[in-house]
């Protein structure tokens, strides 16, 4: 049982994913990282079969890195989403499909706009202002629909995420622990939901909360 959320605001994207890993009714890990940084302003939250998710996330990350090395700049969110969708669509038509659902979020530095994409294992892609995968779909989309609006600031986005998490914990029998990141023009930062004001914490400690992300190399063959 997994759960992930994505929320866009005026100039940011928030991605959150649970940290549980298990099979059937058995939980094997409670610190699994299901968020993968793909670039300085691009990340995804993934869920699905354990082996498929790890292999697919690594495959996507390495190919994004290869694009950086070849072209000296990162792949922008619209192009990245198209390539990820095509990869899943081709895989499901092969003998080795990926049972992976994901939320791809990023900030386009050329247009200064946030992007969020809902993608499933069938290769279906939708551009959305907010989204969820897993068990959270059944109880949180109505909360997002009620409280979301286009020009939400970062603090309001975190508050909406907390509403979704609270609703999920209230309606479901399983308690989830969440890993959360925020993507904006300044890069990717970890959101500590245990803090009273996570956004103020990011502003006060930008380096401590920054998530390490691959950057374009200076020269071909030289890593950043």
Swiss-Prot record:
Sorted UniProt keywords: Cytoplasm, Nucleus, Proteasome
PROSITE patterns named in the record: PROTEASOME_BETA_1, PROTEASOME_BETA_2
Family label: Belongs to the peptidase T1B family.
InterPro entries linked: Ntn_hydrolases_N, Proteasome_beta2, Proteasome_bsu_CS, Proteasome_sua/b, Proteasome_suB-type
PANTHER family found in the cross-reference section: METALLOPROTEASE TLDD, PROTEASOME SUBUNIT BETA TYPE-1
Single GO biological process annotation from the record: proteasomal ubiquitin-independent protein catabolic process
Predominant location: cytoplasm
Protein's UniProt keywords contain Disulfide bond: no
Cited function: Non-catalytic component of the proteasome, a multicatalytic proteinase complex which is characterized by its ability to cleave peptides with Arg, Phe, Tyr, Leu, and Glu adjacent to the leaving group at neutral or slightly basic pH. The proteasome has an ATP-dependent proteolytic activity.
A Gene Ontology term for the protein's cellular component: cytosol
Protein name, entry field: Probable proteasome subunit beta type-4
Lineage: Eukaryota, Fungi, Dikarya, Basidiomycota, Agaricomycotina
CDD domains: proteasome_beta_type_2 (cd03758)
MF annotations from Gene Ontology: endopeptidase activator activity
Localization (cell): Cytoplasm; Nucleus
Pfam families referenced in this protein's UniProt entry, alphabetically: Proteasome (PF00227)
Assembly and interaction partners: The 26S proteasome consists of a 20S proteasome core and two 19S regulatory subunits. The 20S proteasome core is composed of 28 subunits that are arranged in four stacked rings, resulting in a barrel-shaped structure. The two end rings are each formed by seven alpha subunits, and the two central rings are each formed by seven beta subunits. The catalytic chamber with the active sites is on the inside of the barrel.
């Amino acid at each position: 049982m997994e759960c992930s959320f994505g929320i866009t605001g005026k100039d940011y994207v928030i991605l959150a994913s649970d940290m549980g890993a298990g099979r059937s009714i058995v939980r094997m890990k409670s610190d699994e990282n299901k968020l993968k940084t793909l670039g300085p302003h691009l990340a995804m939250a993934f869920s699905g079969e354990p082996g498929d998710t790890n292999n697919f996330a690594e495959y996507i990350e390495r190919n994004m890195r290869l694009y950086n090395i070849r072209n000296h700049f990162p792949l922008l969110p619209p192009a990245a989403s198209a390539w990820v969708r095509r990869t899943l669509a081709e895989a499901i038509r092969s003998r080795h499909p990926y049972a992976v659902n994901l939320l791809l979020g990023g900030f386009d530095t050329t247009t200064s706009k946030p992007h969020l994409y809902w993608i499933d294992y069938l290769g279906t892609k939708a551009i959305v202002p907010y989204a969820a995968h897993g068990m959270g779909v059944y109880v949180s989309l109505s909360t997002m629909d009620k409280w979301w609006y286009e020009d939400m600031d970062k603090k309001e986005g975190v508050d909406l995420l907390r509403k979704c998490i609270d609703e999920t914990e209230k309606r479901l029998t399983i308690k989830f622990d969440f890993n959360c990141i925020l993507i904006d023009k300044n890069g990717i930062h970890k959101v500590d939901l245990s803090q009273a004001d996570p956004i103020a914490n990011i502003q006060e400690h930008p380096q401590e909360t920054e998530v390490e992300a691959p950057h374009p190399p200076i020269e071909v063959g030289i890593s950043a």
